[in-house]
């Protein structure tokens, strides 16, 4: 009799677990189906219409269910500069009365002194992207990461007589960064920034970049956009700014008074 009861309990447990699993799978499928539908609709619009027309017609209707009293903030961040594209980027930002944040490489700062000075003088956010841009070099020892960003700071000071404690680790702060290296940066007052929206501009066309902003940038009160100093990124920048403004975002530079968003803290969307 006892054996029979145990069998019944086991079968009951299996039945309940199966029901719970089925509900979970159904929910996930429904969620993925909804997300895929939105993405497909966005891509269809891009195929059927001129991208400029879509950008011009983008408005807060997409976010009609969000709280309009909630301030929406966007940070446009640009990696790997300065470069031959920096002046064009700065011109576009100036035309749109927008400030971005530049995470710069040490050797590029040395090559493009005038662009570094202009970034600082025009009030953009200033940060560092390292010296080597190589995970083997960057994380060779527990102090090598800190050494790279201290070198960047020295270079910035030599060019502009200013310093910064904003940093972005190449390829993001996870999964490559050892905890000790991350802690060394934080303990030396560096603010590590990742992103919440990757435009994938390094491998995308202009229209694909804009599509990524349209899709992944919806229904968020605060976004950190990752871009790079690429030709296609320059071409997409004006439309990106228009989308953000049409959706009610205030576009701001990152400063040292803002709490960072990174994958260690867990306040980003990977």
Regions found by a protein language model. Name each.
Residues 46, 50-140, 144-158:
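Active-site beta->alpha N-cap acidic-glycine motif
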């Amino acid at each position: 009799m006892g054996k029979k009861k145990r069998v019944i309990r086991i079968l009951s447990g299996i039945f309940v677990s199966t029901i719970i699993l089925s509900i979970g799978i159904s929910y996930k499928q429904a969620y993925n189906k909804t997300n895929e539908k939105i993405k497909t609709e966005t891509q269809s619009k891009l195929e059927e219409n001129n991208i400029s027309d879509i950008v011009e017609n983008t408005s807060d209707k997409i976010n009609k269910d969000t709280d309009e009293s909630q301030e929406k903030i966007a940070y446009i961040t640009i990696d790997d500069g300065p470069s031959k594209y920096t002046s064009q980027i700065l011109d576009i930002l100036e035309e749109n009365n927008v400030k971005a944040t530049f995470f710069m490489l040490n050797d590029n700062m040395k090559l493009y002194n005038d662009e570094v000075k202009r970034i600082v003088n025009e009030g953009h956010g200033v940060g560092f992207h390292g010296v080597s841009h190589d995970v083997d070099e960057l994380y060779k020892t527990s102090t090598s990461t800190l050494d790279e960003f201290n070198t960047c700071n020295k270079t910035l000071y030599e060019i502009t007589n200013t310093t910064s404690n904003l940093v972005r680790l190449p390829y993001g702060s996870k999964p490559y960064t050892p905890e000790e290296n991350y802690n060394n940066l934080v303990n030396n007052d560096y603010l590590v920034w990742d992103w919440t929206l990757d435009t994938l501009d390094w491998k995308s066309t202009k229209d694909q970049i804009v599509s990524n902003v349209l899709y992944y940038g919806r229904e968020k009160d605060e976004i950190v956009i990752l871009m790079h100093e690429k030709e296609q990124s320059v071409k997409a920048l004006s439309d990106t700014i228009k989308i953000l403004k049409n959706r009610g975002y205030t576009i701001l530079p990152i400063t040292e008074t803002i709490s960072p968003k990174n994958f260690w803290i867990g306040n980003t969307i990977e």
